[in-house]
């Protein structure tokens, strides 16, 4: 079997799932103290990298996702599946776990 090369462009979310590039977490506190990885909080903000086709309704139609590629979003803290890709952090989650679009 051939090896699969994963890149952001090859990840195609299914249904109402959204693929988000996680924003960098703070490296130090407001007072200037450097934080170890174990003390950093999991970021809840990221940029939409890929969008699924939308939720399938009972009548067979699709519900169009409310977010688009490039949108900056706020999502639930423990939502989705964490994925590392090319040194960057991503999360794959359901659209219902997105709380807001940030402008």
From Swiss-Prot:
Its main location: cytoplasm. The keyword Chaperone applies. Coiled coil: none annotated. GO terms for biological process: chaperone cofactor-dependent protein refolding. Belongs to the GroES chaperonin family. Together with the chaperonin GroEL, plays an essential role in assisting protein folding. The GroEL-GroES system forms a nano-cage that allows encapsulation of the non-native substrate proteins and provides a physical environment optimized to promote and accelerate protein folding. GroES binds to the apical surface of the GroEL ring, thereby capping the opening of the GroEL channel. This is Co-chaperonin GroES. The gene is groES.
């Amino acid at each position: 079997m051939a090896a699969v090369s994963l890149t952001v462009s090859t990840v195609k979310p299914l249904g109402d799932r959204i693929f988000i590039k996680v924003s960098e977490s703070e490296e130090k506190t407001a007072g200037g103290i450097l934080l170890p990885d174990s003390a950093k909080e999991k970021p809840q903000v990221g940029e939409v990298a890929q969008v699924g086709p939308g939720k399938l309704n009972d009548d067979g139609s699709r519900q169009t996702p409310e977010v688009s590629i490039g949108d900056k979003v706020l999502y639930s803290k423990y939502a989705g599946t964490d994925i590392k890709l090319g040194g960057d952090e991503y999360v794959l989650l359901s659209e219902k776990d997105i709380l807001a679009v940030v402008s």
